[in-house]
Regions:
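Charge-dense, helix-prone N-terminal extensions
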Residues: 1-192
Length: 192
């Protein structure tokens, strides 16, 4: 395995935040041990906490590595200028701003955060509107769910992955027809 630069011993978001305060403008990466899943009120350093703090300083999560059966590390790096932003990460930034945790470095990296910054692909729009039941159910879903779910589909169009675009669109239409919201779209309620 290649050498891991800046493998931090941060045990929580506040310890990572302190490191980012000191190093976000000069370092190119860090690694933190995190756990994925539904955060609980315990001493675990959760993935979503690390991502939120990274976003506050203009950083983003990237590669994960499994060090052992019970230890996964997450690489965090500065965002590249003009990189694609997921709707989920935009909403995380909005939450951090409301909580007073966002820094100028984080704000400087943010894309258009207005509603005008999210445009639905015409193929997805047509597929939803072609079935009245799908359209009615879609309209009843929370706006954040709609943006996050659509974003995870249309990113595959932008990345020129037509098979995955079709597969995700079909799954979305099928679940929407049944009135089912699926997948992680609100960080287990944090973003509501």
């Amino acid at each position: 395995m290649t050498e891991l630069k800046n493998l931090l011993e941060a045990k929580n978001r506040d310890e990572l935040r302190q490191w980012l305060k000191k190093n976000h403008a000069t370092e190119l990466e860090c690694w933190v041990t995190v756990k994925r899943g539904r955060p609980k009120e315990d001493e675990t350093f959760w993935y979503v906490d690390a991502v939120e703090e990274a976003l506050c300083f203009g950083w983003i999560d990237s590669t994960t590595k499994k060090l052992s059966d019970n230890c996964t590390i997450q690489r965090l790096t500065p965002r590249q200028k003009n990189s694609a932003w997921s709707e989920l990460n935009k909403e995380r930034c909005r939450r951090m701003e409301r909580m007073g945790r966002m820094t100028d470095a984080g704000r400087d990296c943010c894309p258009d955060m207005s509603g005008a910054g999210f445009v639905i692909n015409t193929e997805i729009l047509a597929a939803r509107k072609s079935d009245p039941e799908v359209w009615a159910n879609f309209q009843s879903f929370p706006p954040l769910y709609r943006r996050v779910r659509i974003d995870t589909i249309q990113i595959n169009r932008r990345m020129r992955r037509p098979e995955l675009f079709k597969k995700r669109l079909d799954k979305f239409i099928e679940n929407t027809r049944k009135g089912i919201m699926y997948g992680e779209w609100n960080d287990n309620g944090r973003l509501l």
